[in-house]
From Swiss-Prot:
It is found in: Cytoplasm. Component of the eukaryotic translation initiation factor 3 (eIF-3) complex. GO terms for biological process: formation of cytoplasmic translation initiation complex. InterPro entries: eIF3_g (IPR017334), eIF3g_N (IPR024675), eIF3G_RRM (IPR034240), Nucleotide-bd_a/b_plait_sf (IPR012677), RBD_domain_sf (IPR035979), RRM_dom (IPR000504). SMART domains: RRM. Keywords: Cytoplasm, Initiation factor, Protein biosynthesis, RNA-binding. Pfam families: eIF3g, RRM_1. Coiled coil: none annotated. This is Eukaryotic translation initiation factor 3 subunit G. The keyword Cytoplasm applies. Residues 1-31, 151-199 are annotated as: Disordered.
Amino acid sequence: MSRLANSAGDWADDEEFDEAASLPPQQVISNKDGTKTVITYRFNDDGKKVKTTRRIRTTVVKEHVNPRVAERKAWAKFGLEKDHAPGPSLDTTSVGENIIFRPSVNWKAQAKEVEKAGGEKGGLKDQLKDKKVKCRICSGEHFTARCPFKDTMAPVDEPTGPTGGDNEDEERPAGALGSGATAYVPPALRKGGSGGEKMAGRYERDELATLRVTNVSELAEEGELRDMFGRFGHVTRVFLAKDKETNMAKGFAFISFADRADAARACEKMDGFGYRHLILRVEFAKKTT
């Protein structure tokens, strides 16, 4: 009896169960509104038959491109990209943003000078081939920012002690200890105690190209002012004074340009310009002391 049972079990194992044959075929129905209904069947993890209905709408998007661009896209690929599908491949091509190149006014003359210098002295790569990194503090072969003596020594080209003469006491930096090349000078007191010149110079350039705009409407916005003055040059900063409680403009603003010439042109054109039923008064901001 057990022998018959084993044979029956083997017979059941040998028979293959075809899931695809037991499922109804896929159905595609075209609707009057232009859509298609796709009906498919499958078995889930529990072995139950599941019916899936999807409605698909096909949309055709037409894009008008330059004929020359379309012609270049149809060119056959070569090299490692040979026999690949048209268009950029994601594994070999990275599509970036479109950068607008704006050459300077005298870019042709500059290009000729660079080309001439390159022909006489060789390319830039050849000039820098044998150059090594040199620290400005200890003259070592490392970057100045990584110098271990940057907090205790002054750069080689900077005077660290008195140089002699009648005004020796006046020229000696305050806080300097000892004399000679090994004297310690705090970073803030180097170059005769003028540690803040670079920061002041940056703000001074900013003030020279800053316009003060008065008689501004209470409904004015910084974005509108930036668009209005941005026609004359690159605007680096727009400050519109507003009331903290009402968030309304107080009537004046400051516009900073990257170039003073652009600021002068904007001052000439925008002084007396009508904006939101008011006449703007534009002038250069006074230098702070």
